[in-house]
Structure formats: structure tokens, C-alpha cells
Amino acid sequence: MSRYLKHFTAVGDNKSAVPTWHEEDTSHHVTTLHDAPDGLEVSTGQHLGQLSFRDSLRKLYSTERFQIVVVCLVVLDAIFVLCELLIDLSIIEADHHRIAPQVFHYLSLALLTFFMVELAGKIFAYRLEFLHHKFEVFDGIVVVVSFILDIIYISKEDAFDAMGLLILLRLWRVARIINGILVSVQNRANHRVEKLKEINESLVHQVNELKEQNTKMDQENVRLRALLKDHSIDF
């Protein structure tokens, strides 16, 4: 199963930990991008007070709040696109001047602009690592194509109507929205997994400490028993 899941990772995932799931139980010192203190790169060794702009972006993209915001914006984009699609199919009657479709389109384009900025930030923050995650790359391609098609639609709306490509544009946007939701949900799930790993490592550390204390107490008990026996004291 892991052979297929390794292709659907998001930036910031520990790619080396995907093929063998049992390694998570045997190795508790593997540090991922999300595990690094305050989002620092593992190889940099930078001090906590010297966060670069790239490190700040990595930290931002790994936070659960940001993922929640992205999911909300994607759902909002889905509502706008759905309204546009219903108007295009004449299920909902548009006003005489067709102001409502334009409003929905520009609102959706504004959200697409945000996703373009997010994509640029991810590429800047993760660089070549971004290309290793096919799910993110596919989402980025869909975002860019959707943005270009929306810009072309604004300048040549009549051409889209004549060629019958408007519905195709909407359906392409729906595909982008579905993929965006999948990526966002996956990122949130990965973030929760990392949190659970941290809790598990903390519990393992506590168990090891308790075992060490128990061993010391057993040794002390043996020493005291030997001392009492040397002094012929029964107990």
C-alpha cells in the first residue's frame, strides 16, 4: 500500500519514512521538516532566533491554522464556481446585465490569485523538494492553468461562448477545487500525524526514564538487602 501512497505526499512530509511504515516504531529520532524546532531546516542548524524568510514560510505552511484557512478559501471558491456553473447552464436565471456572473467570476479570480501567491511561496520555500511531491505539483499546474484561462476569459469572453469552452473552464475549476481540498485535508492529516509522533516520542521517553528509575531502585534494593545481611539483620 505504501508503494502507492508515497506518490501522494505534500511538501514538508518526510519522504524517506513513507516506504516502510514499521520504521516509525523502531526509530524515534527521525526529524522531519515539521518536527524541526519552529520549522527550521534539519541541515541548517540555525539558532531559533535567526529564522530566515524561507524558514518562516515553511513554518507558516506547516501550521494547522493556515491549512484551515486554505480549506475555507477552497470551499468558498467551490461555491463561487458552482454559482457560475448553474448560471451558465441556465439553472439559475442571471440578471439582464449579467452582473452576478461577473461578480462571482472576479471573486473566484481573487481567490485564484491568493492560490497563485501561495504556490509561489511554496516553490520559494521548498525549491527542488517541491518537485518531489506529485500531488502538490499537480495542484500547482491546475492552479496556473485555471488562472491563465480565467484571465483569457476576462479579455475574450465572447470567444469562450462561441467555442463552447466556458463549461469546460468551469469543470476544470471544479477539478482544481477537488484537488485543492484533497491537498489541504492531506496536509492537515500529516500535521496531526506529526503531532501524534511527537506525543509518542515523549511517552516513549517517559517510559524509558521510568524503566531507568526502576532499575536503579532494584539495584538499591539489592544493595540494601546485602547490607542488612552483612549485619545479620533479619527482615
Swiss-Prot record:
Cytoplasmic topology ranges: 1-65, 127-134, 184-235
Topological domain ranges for the Extracellular compartment: 87-103, 156-162
Keyword Transmembrane helix: yes
MF GO annotations: voltage-gated proton channel activity; zinc ion binding
Gene Ontology biological-process entries: cellular response to pH; cellular response to zinc ion; proton transmembrane transport; response to zinc ion
PANTHER family: F20B24.22, VOLTAGE-GATED HYDROGEN CHANNEL 1
Protein task: Mediates the voltage-dependent proton permeability of excitable membranes. Forms a proton-selective channel through which protons may pass in accordance with their electrochemical gradient.
Coiled-coil zones: 187-231
UniProt organism field: Danio rerio (Zebrafish)
The entry's keywords: Cell membrane, Coiled coil, Ion channel, Ion transport, Membrane, Transmembrane, Transmembrane helix, Transport, Voltage-gated channel
Main location: membrane
Transferase is among the record's keywords: no
Domain text: The segment S4 is probably the voltage-sensor and is characterized by a series of positively charged amino acids at every third position. Unlike other voltage-gated ion channels it lacks the pore domain. The C-terminal coiled coil region mediates homodimerization. It is essential for normal subcellular localization.
Mode of membrane association: Multi-pass membrane protein
Subunit structure: Homodimer.
GO (cellular component) term, any one: plasma membrane
Family statement drawn from the similarity comment of this UniProt entry: Belongs to the hydrogen channel family.
Subcellular localization: Membrane; Cell membrane
Protein name (record): Voltage-gated hydrogen channel 1
Pfam families documented for this protein: Ion_trans
